[in-house]
Design a protein with these regions (language model features):
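Conserved short strand/loop->alpha-helix "switch" segment adjacent to the catalytic nucleotide/phosphoryl-transfer site
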Residues: 35-57
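Conserved beta-strand-loop-beta-strand hairpin that lines the nucleotide-binding pocket
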Residues: 1-21, 64-147
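Histidine-centered phosphotransfer motif of kinases
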Residues: 50-70
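A short beta-loop-alpha structural element at the N-terminal edge
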Residues: 20-26, 30
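Conserved catalytic/ATP-binding subdomain
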Residues: 25, 47-50, 75
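Generic recognition of well-ordered alpha-helical segments
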Residues: 32, 36, 121-124
């Protein structure tokens, strides 16, 4: 996996953007980058950090699993992190350029389909915007003051 990490170029952009090939091992590596960023930025307990990282991992794992299914080459995924110190919120967005897969469109499998439920349980707000040209999953977490 080749991940690239960089601070955003403009103040209105994310504080951190990390991009990697959309594969399962990358989900863990990108989640670790988010954890390191959170530890430097926000003053919350380790349980809250773990919840945020787990939600991020789940969004990344879903992307690695579904975004480029059926395509010859594996695409990329990015995670964007933003800390709004005034609002005391953290917003994480996982972005891909694959094809949106409606979770209700496939056959029911009792061993799968818990990702969105888990993300909803862990974050304060979840938005999913999927199109034929990519998907953007954003998770917002409240009560995250600056260090």
């Amino acid at each position: 996996m080749s991940a690239s990490s960089h601070p955003a170029a403009q103040s209105g952009d994310a504080d951190l953007v990390v991009t990697a090939t959309a594969e399962p091992t990358a989900a863990s590596e990108l989640s670790a980058a988010v954890k390191a960023w959170l530890t430097r930025r926000v003053s919350v307990d380790t349980g809250r950090i773990a919840d945020i990282v787990l939600a991020a991992y789940e969004a990344l794992a879903n992307c690695a699993d579904h975004a480029y299914r059926g395509e010859e080459a594996t695409g990329v995924m990015s995670i964007e992190a933003r800390h709004d110190t005034d609002a005391r919120t953290v917003r994480l967005c996982v972005v891909d350029r694959g094809h949106w897969l409606d979770p209700r469109s496939g056959p029911e499998n009792p061993a799968r389909g818990r990702g969105l439920k888990l993300m909803r349980a862990l974050c304060d707000d979840l938005t999913v915007h999927g199109t034929a040209h990519g998907t953007r999953v954003c998770l917002q977490f409240e009560h995250c003051p600056a260090r």
